[in-house]
């Protein structure tokens, strides 16, 4: 039993490293350019974005947050974020999405330290689920809950690999189609030049004959 448990721990640790999870801490200066963090997500995937912003309302700074993907879908736009802000959504497309922050100065008072410290956590797929709640609701043992989690992470990895394989095939087909078009364009251009050369020869011969030069 102990070797199986140890093996399970190794597998879980590996999948935890390769799973789609990211954490980031940074300072955002008031009036500076917006700061964005980008992640890719598959369609119909659960995403939880947790942002923790220090400071307090009325301190002369307003931190706004918005989440949108590359195809134009918007998933949230919390305003004047202070403390913890959590946004939960399900993606509408296979696309990258941006989590962007802006720090807008408010009021006329002079700020001694015009920065807000931000902590950002983005959980995607199986990592976005509350496994403690699932374990309690379904009355699962800790090992069973961990196996469920590992199974879902593995399924997500397989789905992502299939998506990448399909995209690679699509790009390969596009490349082959482009090569064929270039080939036929080259052949058509060559025959056009040959025809133009033949026409010039015939035209010059007719011209010289009309002038009795040949």
From Swiss-Prot:
Pfam families: EMP24_GP25L. Disulfide bonds: none annotated. Residues 24-183 are lumenal. Residues 34-124 form the GOLD domain. GO terms for cellular component: endoplasmic reticulum membrane; Golgi membrane. The keyword Phosphoprotein does not apply. It is found in: Endoplasmic reticulum membrane; Golgi apparatus membrane. The keyword Ligase does not apply. Keywords: Endoplasmic reticulum, ER-Golgi transport, Golgi apparatus, Membrane, Protein transport, Signal, Transmembrane, Transmembrane helix, Transport. The chain crosses the membrane at residues 184-204. Residues 205-214 are cytoplasmic. GO terms for biological process: protein transport; vesicle-mediated transport. Its main location: endoplasmic reticulum. It is a single-pass type I membrane protein. Belongs to the EMP24/GP25L family. Constituent of COPII-coated endoplasmic reticulum-derived transport vesicles. Required for efficient transport of a subset of secretory proteins to the Golgi. Facilitates retrograde transport from the Golgi to the endoplasmic reticulum. This is Endoplasmic reticulum vesicle protein 25.
């Amino acid at each position: 039993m102990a070797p199986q448990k140890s093996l399970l721990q190794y597998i879980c640790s590996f999948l935890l490293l390769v799973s789609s999870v990211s954490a980031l801490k940074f300072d955002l200066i008031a009036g500076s350019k917006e700061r964005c963090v980008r992640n890719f997500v598959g369609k119909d995937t659960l995403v939880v974005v947790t942002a923790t912003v220090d400071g307090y309302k009325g301190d002369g700074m307003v931190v706004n947050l918005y989440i949108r993907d590359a195809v134009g879908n918007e998933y949230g736009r919390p305003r004047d974020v202070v403390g913890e802000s959590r946004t939960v959504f399900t993606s509408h497309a296979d696309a990258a999405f941006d989590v962007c922050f802006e720090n807008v100065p408010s009021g006329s008072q002079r700020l001694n330290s015009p920065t807000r410290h931000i902590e950002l956590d983005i959980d995607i797929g199986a990592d976005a689920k509350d496994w403690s709640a699932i374990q309690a609701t379904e009355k699962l043992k800790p090992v069973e809950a961990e196996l469920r989690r590992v199974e879902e992470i593995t399924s997500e990895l397989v789905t992502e690999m299939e998506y990448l394989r399909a995209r690679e095939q699509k790009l390969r087909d596009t490349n082959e189609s482009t090569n064929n078009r270039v080939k036929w364009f080259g052949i058509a251009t060559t025959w056009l030049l040959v025809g133009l050369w033949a026409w010039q020869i015939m035209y010059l011969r007719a011209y010289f004959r009309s002038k009795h030069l040949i």
